[in-house]
Amino acid sequence: MVGEHGSLAGRTVLDVGAGPAQFAEAFRAAGARYVAVDADPAGLTTRPAVAARGERLPVADRSVDVCFSSNVVEHVPAPWRFADELVRVTRPGGLVVVAYTNWLSPWGGHETSPWHYLGGYPAAERYGRRYGHPPKNRYGAGLWPVSVAAGLRWARGRPDAELLDARPRYLPAYARGLLRVRGLREVATWNLWLVLRRR
C-alpha cells in the first residue's frame, strides 16, 4: 500500500516500532533501504537497526524518505507526539505512514477484545481471571485508547504535511467513505491507515 504513492526503489525507509521487522522483506523487495527502530533492543532481529523510543528518535530532521509505523500509536501514551516525530525525520516530499488499531474497533482491546467495550480496566481484569495472568497489552500501561477522529484531526491539521490517503486498512479502498460517518468509523474501521507527504 505504501508503493501506491511512489516508487520505493533507492529510498530510505525507517520502520518505527518495527518489532520483529515483519515488513523488512517487502520493503527490501521493493528496492528500499530498510532501517528498523524499536524500543526493545532484544526484539530487533534485522540490521541495520536502532534501539530507540519513537517519541525521541535519534535521527536528524528531514533525513529519511519514508517513515513508517504500523500498530504502534495505540501503544504509546502520547500518540500524536510520537507521530510528530515521524514527520520531523521525514524529508520534504517524503512519505509518513501511520497505521493503528483504534480503540472502538472490534480488536481495539487487543487480546482483551471484545470486553474492552465495557472499559479497559474491567477487560484486563476479566482477562486475568480467565487466563491466570495479565494481558500483554495492559490498558493504561502498554495500550491506550486512540480514536479514528483523533488520527484524522492530527493528519489534517499539520502545516508541514499534506494528507494523501486515509482509509480503513483492512477493508477495500472503496470503504474510505466510512471515515466520513462519525461513530460508525470508530467501530467499522478496525485499523486506520494514514499517508502524508512532508512539505
Task: Describe these PLM feature segments.
Residues 2-108, 194-198:
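Conserved SAM-binding loop
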Residues 77-85, 91, 95-195:
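S-adenosyl-L-methionine-dependent methyltransferase catalytic module, highlighting the catalytic core
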